[in-house]
Amino acid sequence: MTATPAHHAATAISVVPMPARLGAEILGVDLRQRPDADTFAHILDALHRHGVIFLRGQSLTPEQLAVFSTCFGELDIHHMTEHVFPHLPQVRVLSNVKKDGKSIGITKGGMHWHSDLSYKPQPALVTLLYAVECPPTGADTQFADMYAAFADLPEAKRKKLQSLRAVHDRNYRYSELYPGRPPLTPEQVAKVPPVEHPLVRVHPATGRPALFV
């Protein structure tokens, strides 16, 4: 399958869809400077159209990453404060690297299929992952197209699911999923009580329904 880049005359941006139906690469953007309104509008449009966007070759400080992230809205501060920058708690470090026998970041973060912060009353609008060091191919970060997962179901199943809700519990099976981590403290548990969400959510910008499980 050949992907045709979409060029935007007003900016230097090109959007190149991935061969699969999920994801696109954005070219011609340097995130060291906060993008202007027109440039960000193209970035946001690409995200809405393709679900996942990639901007390769960036060289960012944590502060620059946070500044770009604020283009999408107010940043969340995670209820677990390990491995964050003291002056920038909105940015968490995930890593399998150890220094002096200690992990320099969260290990095995999100090793099961999940949607970030689904356990909060207002789930995350978007997650930004800045890869500092990664293998040339493969690796463990994967994405699932939940628009397609819903659309590919039989009509009767789609109709049934649209009437159902599910409980999202941050603390459910935590110790089983993360046996190498200390158990959650009572304070951490209290910060994220179980919440309910529809099994099918409609994206506020695109109007497209997606499974949310």
Describe the role of every protein-language-model region.
Residues 2-213:
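Non-heme Fe(II) oxygenase catalytic core, chiefly the N-lobe of the double-stranded beta-helix
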